[in-house]
Swiss-Prot record:
PROSITE patterns: RIBOSOMAL_L34 (PS00784)
Name of the protein this chain belongs to: Large ribosomal subunit protein bL34
HAMAP family attached to this UniProt entry: Ribosomal_bL34
Entries under InterPro entries matching the protein: Ribosomal_bL34, Ribosomal_bL34_CS
Domain of life: Bacteria
PANTHER family: LARGE RIBOSOMAL SUBUNIT PROTEIN BL34M, MITOCHONDRIAL RIBOSOMAL PROTEIN 34 FAMILY MEMBER
Family: Belongs to the bacterial ribosomal protein bL34 family.
Classification via Gene3D superfamilies: 1.10.287.3980
GO molecular function annotations of the record: structural constituent of ribosome
Length: 44
């Protein structure tokens, strides 16, 4: 049986990347929340 997680960088970036987050209001909310929390990595 094939495992469910088959990592690839392109789809990863396209769905969870910084630029994608910045596109929508809610995405920006996510980035700001992570900034406020002091996360080292804001996005993928």
């Amino acid at each position: 049986m094939k495992r469910t997680y088959q990592p690839h960088n392109t789809p990863r970036k396209r769905t969870h990347g910084f630029l994608v987050r910045m596109k929508t209001k809610n995405g920006r909310k996510v980035i700001n929340a992570r900034r406020a929390k002091g996360r080292k990595k804001l996005s993928v």
